[in-house]
Design a protein with these regions (language model features):
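Fe-S-dependent hydro-lyases/dehydratases of central metabolism
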Residues: 1-416
Length: 416
């Protein structure tokens, strides 16, 4: 009798090289290894040990975490922090020395790795993608297994094109119905985290399923998988479907001709089999979800915009009660305050979660004809997104409203 497999099972089996201990870690093959300016020490370690990058064509370097988003005509010299400048330059030097592909600060397709990779079609169903950044979970939107790795793992992957990984448990989150107008994938994932908690997905790979998930665009799916780690999950995944294939068909690095037909046949075999089992299940009704706002400092400290700041003293979980009290003090909020009455200090539109063209279109539609009353900046996720937005006149909408229009980078997420 054939065992019903999940999407994750299939990818795991395809990439497992060895597993000396059935209950221990497995050695997995890595299709793409993504690095940014931060893990320069991994390249230093290789150099000191006399080793080279095992497969340079499968390591991709992105200048994104510490690149300046203003005065870009000056290149890395525009970075006010000498350490940041050095890391940007080191990445370029390491990429040149090891012959890996590098989207540097002056590259016409420069941007945040988790925006550039998908828009170029580098992420494809069935792949295993590792990255020196926790939001590598983004690639799960394509039916790939994407996850972040630590310092020593980056060096190991550079040297071997493989990684030791303990098999996680599996969770399925099924979202039925449809999201209401004005409710986004960001609201959906915040509602999920608010329900299951920031540790609710710990030790699991999450597969998102259901009619509401199928109705999402690829960019919305990326937002969902990008934030799956915020509930402690090792990765978030969505089975590939016609929406996935249509998106990839337009991408630069997608297979072409006969290779496309062969890839498509393989991709169609990946969705979880009927009857496949999961270690945990959660169900949500998309129609009941409203726009969400985080009132604290963790993503599970979230309530609908129509709600009020809660009183942590009423929380039954002692850890959440303590965290909530600390968060309220930090945020200078009082229990019972209506969220709609809370003033904001500044606005940031961007990041690998929401710096894509759909996000900018949505934001511009709300900003048009209005004026910002607080400092506000918009940072497109990539140069391609920036050019597309400018071609549509979105930059003018933001600028006329008093927003700063900047160059791509991680920006406020990394303090750069």
């Amino acid at each position: 009798m054939t065992v019903a497999l999940t999407l994750f099972d299939k990818i795991w089996d395809l990439h497992r090289i060895a597993q000396p201990d059935p209950d221990g870690e497995a050695l997995l093959y890595v299709d793409w290894n993504l690095v940014h300016e931060g893990p320069f020490y991994a390249f230093d370690g290789l150099k000191r040990s006399g080793r080279t990058v095992r497969r340079p064509s499968q390591t991709l370097a992105f200048a994104d975490h510490y690149v300046p988003t203003t005065r870009r005509e000056f290149g890395s010299a525009a970075a006010s922090d000498p350490e940041a400048r050095n890391m940007i330059d080191q990445l370029a030097a390491n990429a040149d020395r090891t012959q890996i592909v590098h989207w540097g600060i002056d590259h016409p397709q420069q941007g945040i790795m988790h925006v550039v990779g998908p828009e170029l079609g580098l992420a494809q169903p069935g792949m295993l993608i590792s990255g020196a950044d926790s939001h590598t979970t983004t690639y799960g939107a394509f039916g790939a297994l994407g996850y972040g790795v630590g310092a020593s793992q980056v060096e190991h992957i550079l040297a071997t094109q493989s990684v030791w990984y303990r098999r996680p448990r599996q969770m399925r989150i099924t979202v039925g119905g449809r999201l209401a107008p004005g409710v986004s994938a960001k609201d959906l994932i915040l509602a999920i985290i608010a329900k299951i908690g920031i540790g609710g997905g710990a030790g699991h790979v999450i597969e998102f399923a259901g009619s509401a998930i199928s109705a999402l665009s690829m960019e919305a799916r990326m937002t969902l998988c990008n934030m799956s780690l915020e509930c402690g999950a090792r990765a978030g995944m969505i089975a590939p479907d016609e929406t996935t294939y249509a998106y990839l068909s337009r991408c630069q690095f997608a297979p072409k001709g006969q290779a496309w037909d062969e890839a498509l046949a393989f991709w169609r075999s990946l969705p979880s089999d009927s009857g496949a089992t999961f270690d945990a299940e959660h169900h949500f009704d998309a129609g009941s979800i409203e726009p969400m706002v985080t009132w604290g400092t963790n993503q599970d400290e979230t309530v609908p915009i129509s709600g009020c700041v809660p009183d942590p003293a009423t929380f039954t979980d002692l850890d959440r009660r303590a965290r909530g009290a600390t968060a309220l003090e930090y945020m200078q909020l009082s229990p019972g305050t209506a969220l709609k009455e809370v003033r904001i200090d500044r606005v940031f539109i961007g990041s690998c979660t929401n710096g894509r063209i759909e996000d900018l279109r949505e934001a511009a539609s709300l900003v048009a004809g209005r004026k910002a009353r607080v400092p506000a900046i918009v940072v497109p996720g990539s140069m391609s997104v920036k050019r597309a937005a400018e071609a549509e006149g979105l930059d003018r909408v933001f600028i006329e409203a008093g927003f700063e229009w900047r160059a791509p980078g991680c920006s406020m997420c990394t303090g750069s």
